[in-house]
A protein has these predicted regions:
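Acidic, surface-exposed loops and disordered segments
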Residues: 1-172
Length: 172
């Protein structure tokens, strides 16, 4: 039986690295942001922020910080704020990045569910991004960029490569 629901969505999602030259409607952007806003976070601290970049002059500036925006018409920038996050007393770990990654995953999967494409981009100059928007990003670590739009390419070869279930999962 074919999968449905979330598993189907997870199967169908891939890193999209080419986009149509077509804007994403505001109501879809709102849904994507809502999916990210609803993400869980440690002790519900919600130390996460998402910025929307779609104005051509902003996209041009962002493109100086990474090779991986693929001329997308829209980029989500996800930040985590360590001063707002929960810190475990067991190991002293600050969970800002964990919380930001959960919200980022919600965002990425909602993009997929809306029939759009995106790519989680971790290879960018975070200091350069912050230098472009110093007031907005004061206190925030920049965790990921998501170039987003209507897909104009399918998955790369890497998409099909996953560990076997035997390697991936185990019983204790
Ligand atoms: C934390 C993280 C950082 C990534 N950074 C980049 C990146 O900078 N550039 C890029 O093209 N893809 C990036 N990717 C996408 C991965 O290469 C991709 O998810 C992986 O190869 C599996 O392919 P798939 O997403 O198509 O299934 C990143 C993914 C993750 C989760």
């Amino acid at each position: 039986m074919a999968n449905s629901g979330f598993l189907k969505l997870a199967e169908e999602r891939y890193s999209c690295r080419a986009f149509e030259n077509k804007p994403v409607p505001d109501e879809l952007i709102d849904k994507i942001l809502e999916a990210a806003r609803l993400a869980p976070s440690a002790v519900n601290r919600q130390p996460v922020k998402v910025w929307v970049a779609r104005r051509p002059e902003v996209l041009e500036k962002l493109a100086t910080t990474t090779k991986y925006l693929f001329d997308a018409p829209l980029v989500f920038v996800v930040g985590g704020n360590p001063s707002q996050a929960w810190v475990s007393r067991h190991d002293g770990k600050n969970r800002a990045e964990t919380d930001a990654c959960i919200a980022a995953t919600h965002l990425m999967m909602e993009i997929q569910d809306l029939g759009l494409g995106s790519c989680w981009v971790g290879s960018f100059d975070a200091a350069a991004v912050k230098a472009l928007f110093p007031e907005e990003m004061e206190g925030w670590d920049i965790i990921a960029l998501f170039p987003t739009g209507y897909p104009a390419a399918g998955p790369s070869e890497r998409h099909a490569v996953r560990k076997s279930m035997e390697e991936f999962a185990g019983e204790l």
